[in-house]
Amino acid sequence: MKTYLQLLEHILQQGVEKSDRTGTGTLSVFGYQMRFDLTKGFPLVTTKKLHTRSIVHELLWFLRGDTNISYLKENGVTIWDEWADNNGDLGPVYGKQWRSWPTADGHTIDQLSDVVQQIKSNPDSRRLIVSAWNVGELDKMALMPCHALFQFYVANNKLSCQLYQRSADVFLGVPFNIASYSLLTHMVAQQCNLDVAEFIWTGGDCHLYLNHLEQAQIQLTREPLPLPSLTIKRKPASLFDYAYEDFEFLNYQSHPAIKAPIAV
């Protein structure tokens, strides 16, 4: 995961100081890309420990089309707590847009189901896209989508995925996003009887919050460890039937966790 450390270093060296919605302040760069070969290990950051339970359960929660944090809390995941209302609701965030994007005529579109079907029937399509950026519902969301759009690509019976992340909290958020979309790529590949190829992460406003700079510098002193591998223990009937127990990250070694405050 030296690729990720290079992004940290790039922001520390080249970033410009900017104000932000949270009032914390950031060092920011615009436009950055990282590529991860999924055949050479699963891209979990090793220079600090990641909470893989949160990564898996959050993705399963998205896939359910859920927008209430009750499922997350039942499974010991707190990463969305700060944005939920008193009832645990977040408004029409990721899961809603992925699974039931509303249309003008009162119907909904299950973007993910459609994309999986397209990959199976027309793998050369250039329209294998899922978007969470629904302009008509942004004002109803507790947090507008940071990872806004992703696209699949099939070549030589191998599946790749590229994510566009308009706003990237590089210290806290991006390691989760890399792992989450890499996991999704593995799951979709299994459902479509494909092998995996690459996950490509493309960031817009890539930033380190000013109260994360020391933590980023600590992380840069650590030597990356070998990447783990992912085992998916069964192939369920659909993309939406996976369970937490279906996934195992083999040989995940990491340096200790590094605590940092979240900007709300």
UniProtKB/Swiss-Prot annotation:
Name the record gives this protein: Thymidylate synthase
Binding annotation for (6R)-5,10-methylene-5,6,7,8-tetrahydrofolate: 51, 169, 263
The protein's assembly and partners: Homodimer.
Keywords of the record: Cytoplasm, Methyltransferase, Nucleotide biosynthesis, Transferase
Gene3D superfamilies reported for this sequence: Thymidylate synthase/dCMP hydroxymethylase domain
Main localisation: cytoplasm
Purpose: Catalyzes the reductive methylation of 2'-deoxyuridine-5'-monophosphate (dUMP) to 2'-deoxythymidine-5'-monophosphate (dTMP) while utilizing 5,10-methylenetetrahydrofolate (mTHF) as the methyl donor and reductant in the reaction, yielding dihydrofolate (DHF) as a by-product. This enzymatic reaction provides an intracellular de novo source of dTMP, an essential precursor for DNA biosynthesis.
Places the protein is found: Cytoplasm
